């Protein structure tokens, strides 16, 4: 499974740098000079192209990245919208209990401890207050805090996430 670690927002300047929106918890590890990145025009098309990073610098909450072979604004602008991806098999295993990669949680069926089906985890949102699970259900979407008091169990093998929601939480989606 491919995981997106960054997205090219636009070209920067005339020498071929690109502005990259970071989508990884490890930008210092993923975006370093000498590292190889695979860029794809979209998630569903082709194998993409590999680039070697020549330079990186911070640009607010984004990065300015110089890629080998991208030496002018036109070439850089051609990368606009490209996604930098890695293979999930390349991720190190997680040693901490009750800790998961986002892609492991996305797609899990959500049910309550009483056995009521709620929906499917569509996305994991990272906020200043903590992680939220965006759960798609028949009535729309419900945001469930990913905390031990609410998420009682996660079974990756069975593809089920069990919650004990406080009163009213599931009513917010309707």
From Swiss-Prot:
UniProtKB keywords: Chaperone, Cytoplasm, Ribosome biogenesis, rRNA processing
GO BP terms in the entry: ribosomal small subunit biogenesis; rRNA processing
Keyword Signal annotated: no
Keyword Thylakoid on entry: no
Alphabetized Pfam families for the sequence: PRC_RimM, RimM
GO cellular component: cytoplasm; ribosome
Gene3D superfamilies, per the entry: PRC-barrel domain, RimM
Domain PRC barrel: 96-169
Annotated compartments: Cytoplasm
Subunit and partners: Binds ribosomal protein uS19.
The family this protein is said to belong to: Belongs to the RimM family.
Protein name per the record: Ribosome maturation factor RimM
Organism annotation: Mycobacterium marinum (strain ATCC BAA-535 / M)
